[in-house]
Regions:
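Hydrophobic/aromatic-lined pockets within catalytic cores
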Residues: 49-54, 142-145, 172-176, 221
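Metal-dependent nuclease catalytic regions and adjoining charged, substrate-binding loops involved
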Residues: 90, 166-251
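Secondary-structure boundary elements
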Residues: 102-108, 133-139, 172-181
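Coil-to-beta-strand transition motifs
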Residues: 122-126, 133-135, 191-194
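Short helix/strand-bridging catalytic loops that position acidic/His residues to coordinate divalent metals
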Residues: 146-158, 202
Length: 251
């Protein structure tokens, strides 16, 4: 592994990018952090659900019309450091968390938004645990459909099982959730009827996460830190071509 290759600790997000290609990881490290409306909405939901006591300190509700003009500028100055939201945005977020906040497991939590730092194969990792308690680690994921079949698709598409393995692995050293905790995901719908559902991640998925993470770390250790595309994973044939084969599910 090239010295100085690791610019910062790896994370669930960055290792997923590296699994696509080294160029994806470099782009992830280099990109400017741009806060999108979807990200703002997700943060608002997380704060309302997990840390409602921080709402007054971190948010200000703008009751006026267009976000422009002297009146709005004065409001901004009076609320420096706060995220400014509209009443309808707050109202929608409150509807979204109404069902989720009554979840039994969520109400057994002993901590939220825990920063964790640990190592796998001497490679530093960093993460943030949404909520945890004795015997469990929990994560909140917003989605359009929290039904079992639909959320399973999201779970696989976004590789949430990798995050589950990483945080369980961190707990083996840090023990913030006790011995041998289970991993849960609270899926929260962001559109009517705003259902929520708690899912336990199976041992099979945890093992799948472990397998993919360790394979990615083997590749990461081989990487010289220089830009590389899909050829890094030996997928190319002659003349830089990749053959698209029939996937197993179509056979």
């Amino acid at each position: 592994m090239k010295k100085g290759k690791i610019r910062r600790p790896l994370s669930y997000s960055s290792i997923k990018e590296f699994m696509k290609s080294p160029n994806h990881l470099l782009s992830y490290w280099d990109r400017e952090k741009v806060t999108t409306p979807a990200m703002l909405k997700g943060t608002l939901i997380h704060t309302l659900l997990l840390e409602p006591e921080k709402m007054e300190k971190e948010y200000a509700t703008w009751l006026g019309g267009r976000r422009a003009g002297n009146e709005y500028k004065t409001f901004q100055e009076e609320n420096q450091g706060k995220t400014i939201i509209k009443p309808e945005e707050l109202e929608e977020a409150e509807k979204i968390i109404k069902n989720a906040k009554n979840n039994v497991l969520l109400n057994l939590k002993k901590g939220v938004e825990l920063e964790i730092l640990w190592k796998i194969n001497l490679i530093p990792f960093r993460g943030f645990v949404d909520f945890y308690g004795d015997g469990f680690i929990g994560d909140v994921k917003t989605c359009s459909d929290a039904s079992p079949k639909a959320f399973q698709r999201d779970f696989i598409k976004f590789k949430y099982y990798i995050q589950a393995f990483l945080y369980l692995n961190a707990n083996e050293t840090l023990m913030f959730a006790g011995e041998n905790p289970d991993y849960f995901i609270l899926a929260v719908e962001t559109s009517p009827p705003y259902n929520s559902q708690m899912y336990k991640v199976s041992t099979e998925f945890i093992e799948k996460g472990k397998e993919e993470v360790h394979k990615a770390l083997q590749d990461f250790e081989k990487w010289d830190g220089e830009p590389a595309g899909y050829e890094f994973y030996d997928l190319l044939e002659e003349n830089g071509v990749i053959t698209l084969n029939l996937p197993e599910w179509m056979q």
